[in-house]
Amino acid sequence: MKEFLAVGEIINTHGIKGEVKVYPLTDDMKRFKKLKEVFIDGEERKILSCKLQPNNVVLKIEGIDSIEEANKYRKKLLEIKRENSVKLPKGSYFIADLIECRVIDEDGREIGQISDVIKTGSNDVYEVKGKSEVLVPAIKDIVTNIDIENKTVTIKPLEIWQCE
């Protein structure tokens, strides 16, 4: 499992004093209010202030003191140590842990690997790349087991639930 988890991506500058606008990669933006530090390119940085906007977060990060400096951080990921992450409820997983999981069906047939997790609102969808690309709804009727330790996700056979 990865030691660091991405919680946001710097998408723009905000103002002229080095604040950055962050697109959250977490399902609860309020978590940013509790963050004391983040890692950017492996370097620890203190969070000096946090403002929540409807779809983004504005952060003042230690060492970024001008709009020019903030511009250098566009498209950079903000990461936290796994040990500082929220504890997930049973049956919930970090996207970082699902990516590259091997997907097999209940008959043992290899489908591919999870390459992305798409948020749809009602349920997540796993993008699985193998011989072809398969979109797998992340619902209990289809996904029967997730074993993060062994990086394996088991689903019902495609012919049972997939429309041609």
From Swiss-Prot:
Residues 90-161 form the PRC barrel domain. This is Ribosome maturation factor RimM. GO terms for biological process: maturation of SSU-rRNA. It is found in: Cytoplasm. Pfam families: PRC_RimM, RimM. The keyword Transport does not apply. Its main location: cytoplasm. Belongs to the RimM family. GO terms for cellular component: cytosol; ribosome. The gene is rimM.
